[in-house]
A protein has these predicted regions:
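Conserved active-site "lid/cap" helical segment
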Residues: 1-77, 84-87, 92, 155-164, ...
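Flexible glycine-/small-residue-enriched beta->alpha junction loops
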Residues: 2, 107-160
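N-terminal extracellular/periplasmic Venus flytrap/periplasmic-binding protein-like
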Residues: 11-14, 25-35, 43-45, 169-252, ...
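Short, well-ordered secondary-structure micro-motifs
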Residues: 18-19, 66-67, 125-127, 205-206
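Conserved catalytic cysteine-centered active-site region
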Residues: 58-112, 132, 143-151, 212, ...
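Active-site-proximal alpha-helical scaffold in enzymes
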Residues: 88-119, 157-187, 252, 257
Length: 260
């Protein structure tokens, strides 16, 4: 029988724009994540020597997020030196997969107490910084029918029959729900303010939610992946899905978040 697994607590940083103009641009990834470990230790008066492992997902594990960033974060938070750390990359599912693996470790009886999550600072380590065969090897890309994720999303929308207006309406409702949750305190216990080395608060709550977004406003934006699609990726998609009409580009890329 698997050992029962419980998530005891969940915390994150507030989110801001994932560009150099974002509020958290000056904060290093290891400081973002270490602040959360420090808060967990204080909140539960945790003897960190009991932690069996820290598992962290990271999509671009290079530069300031490179090496084994999970272990770097453990050290930066000044947890017990016996606590190990492991970094994993499953693209956008990296943080979730870290939690899955932590649960598997406990369920198997191998370990008892595991901290899991993810760290990513897109304002300091831009998406695609780590390269890879998909990005830099055209022969591999054609062989595997690779297209960028955004074009993949637009292909799914085309196959499923979702219109541009459908996804714009969903985007608007998502912004409104996020603002409602923030403004009504639903995130208060889980969002941990980011502070500088002097203890001064840099960001206390999510500052890039846009509740005033409208379907009409979004309709005026150009699809983000229409141009890359016309440069050859559409041909790759249509070769794989030969019954598909031309890809309908519905996907909009707004500036993304930075946080943990």
């Amino acid at each position: 029988m698997p050992t029962p697994v419980y998530i005891y607590d969940a915390v994150r940083t507030p989110r801001s724009k994932g560009k150099s103009t974002g509020t958290l641009h000056e904060v290093k990834p290891i400081d973002l994540a270490a602040g959360l470990l420090v808060e967990l230790q204080k909140r539960h008066d945790l003897d960190t020597s009991y932690v069996d492992d820290v598992v962290m997902g990271c999509v671009s594990p290079v530069g300031e997020q490179g090496s084994d960033v999970a272990k770097m974060v453990v050290q930066n938070a000044e947890w017990d030196e016996s606590v190990p750390g492991v970094q994993l990359d499953r693209f956008c599912a990296s943080g979730l997969e870290a939690v899955n693996i932590a649960a598997q470790k406990v369920a198997s009886g191998w370990e008892d107490l595991v901290v899991a999550g993810g760290v990513e600072s897109m304002s300091r380590v831009p998406m695609g910084s780590n390269g890879g065969a998909m990005a830099g090897d055209p022969e591999f890309a054609v062989k595997t029918s690779f297209v960028p994720q955004g074009i993949g999303a637009d292909t799914i929308a085309t196959l499923a029959g979702w219109s541009r207006e459908d996804v714009d309406q969903y985007a608007v409702s998502s912004q409104q729900r996020a603002a409602n949750a923030r403004d009504n305190g639903w995130f208060d216990r889980s969002v941990i303010p980011v502070k500088d080395s002097s203890g001064v608060t840099i960001l206390e709550r999510d500052d890039f939610i846009k509740p005033d977004t409208t379907v009409e406003g979004l309709a005026g934006l150009k699809p983000s992946f229409e141009v890359p699609g016309s440069m050859g990726f559409d041909d790759v998609i249509l070769a794989k899905y030969n019954t598909l009409d031309p890809v309908s580009y519905t996907h909009l890329t707004l500036p993304t978040s930075v946080g943990v």
